Structure formats: structure tokens, C-alpha cells
């Protein structure tokens, strides 16, 4: 089901059109792994911790524009129309970490963050 849904994104959605164009121009990047070190105090409520926590992840995709980077992540959560804010809230911290990692890896600013909800067939700006 997910691959069919992704095909729908790629064919019909504005995001898909932009991804196709970026791919043609060599500006589309998919499944980008990263490992970043963060002070524990930045990730947890334990103030004063001097330890470094390694955060490992895989960014579903991003593409480069003249203005910077558009970050995107696919979500399979079961949602009802109107639940967009729930999705944004649920993944806010994850997307902040992805944004930070991309900016450090590329030296470019992330100018837009997008979540694609398969259950809503909708692209949501985060």
C-alpha cells in the first residue's frame, strides 16, 4: 500500500511534480542517513548533563532550490481530516533534528519542511 501511495504522491501531487523536476536536475536526495551528536541537556529535561547523545536517522527526502532546501518526510499514521495539527505536533522534534542535521551536512538553510500523510493524501507544512 505504501508504494502505491508514494506513486500517487509522485504522479498527482504538487510535491511529486517538484520532486520529479528536482530529480531531472540532480537536486533530489532520498533516504539520506545521518548521525549527529547533541548535548544530552538539549534533548532531555536532565539539566546539567555533560554527556553527548548520538542521534541516528534516515531523512526520507529533500531537494535543493535556489533559496535553500525543502525537507520532506512521509507519514503512515492513521488520521482523519482535520488532524493535521496532531501530525505536526507528533513529529515536530524529529523534524527539528532532521533540519539541523541537513543544515550541518549541506551548509545550506532548510527553507521548508513538509510532511506527506498517506492516510490524508495530503502534504502538510511543518
Where are these regions (language model features)?
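Single conserved hydrophobic/aromatic residue that forms the stacking wall/gate
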Residues: 1-10
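A short acidic/basic microdomain associated with nuclease active sites
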Residues: 20-43, 47-49
